[in-house]
Every structure is written in structure tokens, then in C-alpha cells.
Amino acid sequence: KVTFRNRYGITLVGDLYVPKNIRSGQKLPAIAVVGAFGAVKEQSSGLYAQAMAERGFVTLAFDPSYLGESGGEPRNMASPDINTEDFSAAVDFLGLQNFVNREQIGILGICGWGGMALNAAVGDTRIKAVATSTMYDMTRVMANGYEINMKQNAQGGYDRAQPQMDAEARYQTKVQLNNGRWEAAQNGYATLAPANNLDPKDITADTPKFIAEYADFYHTKRGFHPRAVNSNPQGSWATTVPLAFINMPILQRAGELRAPTLIVHGEKAHS
């Protein structure tokens, strides 16, 4: 277990995986891994990190700011700026290890952290490769809603659809969120939105398949972790989280990304 700080002074906690067959003085390529959005390092990112370490990489699965074992108050907060910085802070940490090759540091983002990973790779030229797995751009999701039909098509995939929110709906959402800030401010901005994943027993035939799949992972022994936002039955993200994501889109300079990029998606992936 390791700790390091980002440039905002928040202490991040991660699990560092080093291949068993590393030789004295050897410098290996390294990968920082985060995700999914609302998950902790003991879930998907730790599995990815372990698998890549078995393939010869030094890997770091870490909890981003405000989540899991990492620092930051209030809890269950997210920020497109700070969370992009978290990836660069991980690159800082990896590059300071004497067994890591600074010219071979990459990052991997899962789910909503895929968008953050791409955003970090645009801004941080030390990132020599970037990969995403079933990525979302969470700024786009929170600003537009899902841009797909919620029900699967005959082939089991998801058809594109008009965004769920237009400018007027987005404005009304901001009105509601900002009015709620009075209560959140009184509570130290620690007020949480309702839990964002169903309990498996509440799934019905009308539940969209991807929501049922979330429940089957985050609320069962398969994927549950008590520190994960997505596993918390009492609440999910802080209520003010969407405000920055709606107003500060990431990937505005994605066309300037020069690092080799791998975007991995399932054939029927919801995102």
C-alpha cells in the first residue's frame, strides 16, 4: 500500500503491484489504473492492475480524491479538474520510483474514469500511452443524460437516441441543484444523493439490463465493497457533484491527443 499527494494537497492511497521477476536495477513500464466511476481500488481497478503486473508492468490501482481510502473532504465528491489531476499525480509517483522507466508510463481508465484518462493524457505529455475500458465522458452524461434508448434492441445492444436533456431541461436541473446548495452548505456539503444502484431484490422485468447488471455487481458478494459509492445502500454521490460536470466539459482538446490510445468496448456495451 502506498500514499502520494496530488498538486491540490490531497493524499491519495493506492496499491502498488510489482512483477515478481523484476531484476535488480531494472526499470519497467508502468500503468496507473482507476475506475469504475464510484468504485474503489479493491474492485475493478485492482483486478486490472494485478493482471497487467502479471504481464510485466509495474501497476498502481488507486482511489481518487474524496473516495475510498484517499483523502479529501467532503466525502463522495468528484471534480473533472481534480480527478484529471489525480492521474497526473499517479504519474508523478510512478516516475519517482527507481524501478520505473519514466519514458514508459501509461494510464488506464475504466467507465467514467476512461474520460478522465483521455483528458489527462491530452494535458500531461509524460503519459506515453492511454487506454480506456467501457468508457463514459461523465461531463457529457451529466449535461445531456444518456444518449441511448434505455432498452436493448433485438441484437442485445443499445440504439442511439436524442439526449435526455436539452438546454431548458439542463437549466431546470441546475436550478434544482443550486437551490439544494443551501441545505448542502449547512451540512458541510456532505449531503448525499439517493443510492444510485438498485438492490438486486428490487429488480423487475422492466428494469433496464445495464442497471440490473450494476446491481448484480455492486450489491452482491461478487463486487460489493463497503467503501465504494456504488455499493452504498444509504446514499451515493454528494448532491453538488453534477454542477461542475455539467458546466466544465472535459475532452475539449481531444483532437490534440498524441499518445497512443486504445479504447476497448464490448460489442453491446451500454456506454
For each feature predicted by the language model, list its residue ranges:
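Alpha/beta-hydrolase active-site loop
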Residues: M77-N98
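Alpha/beta-hydrolase fold nucleophile elbow
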Residues: N98-C111
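Alpha/beta-hydrolase-fold enzymes
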Residues: N119-H219
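N-terminal cap/lid segment of alpha/beta-hydrolase-fold proteins
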Residues: K1-Q26
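Short beta-strand element of the alpha/beta-hydrolase
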Residues: G25-A36
